[in-house]
């Protein structure tokens, strides 16, 4: 049987309750509920669905949102790749979970 993986990424850890971040935070919470719903819908199939919270990652979007932040002091994209690799293995049993890709 072929296992199919679906990942949704969402970073809501620090967005909740921040002034002027309401629409952004609401969209991230909505993604979390959507992933849980999708996971329930495909529970009896070979599809695994998980939400990955990458935490702060040095991206262009983050640099624009947080000017002056030292991009070298936060995770780099390659730092979180292992989380996605681990979730996509045949031995991974996680389904319908919110997984943090950072320490």
Predicted features along the sequence, with ranges:
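Hydrophobic structural elements of the Rossmann-like NAD(P)H-binding subdomain
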Residues: 6, 49-52, 62
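Short acidic, glycine/proline-rich loop/turn micro-motifs
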Residues: 18-20, 62-66
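Catalytic loop of short-chain dehydrogenase/reductase
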Residues: 4-30, 35-44, 56
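C-terminal helical subdomain
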Residues: 44, 51-52, 59, 67-103
């Amino acid at each position: 049987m072929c296992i199919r993986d679906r990942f949704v990424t969402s970073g809501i850890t620090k967005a909740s309750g921040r002034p002027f971040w309401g629409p952004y935070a609401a969209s991230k919470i909505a993604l979390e509920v959507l992933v849980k719903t999708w996971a329930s819908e495909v529970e009896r199939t070979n599809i695994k669905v998980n939400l990955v919270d990458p935490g702060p990652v040095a991206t262009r979007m983050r640099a624009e949102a947080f000017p002056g932040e030292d991009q070298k002091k936060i995770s780099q994209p390659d730092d979180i790749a292992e989380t996605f690799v681990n979730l996509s293995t045949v031995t991974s049993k996680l389904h319908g979970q919110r997984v943090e890709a950072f320490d």
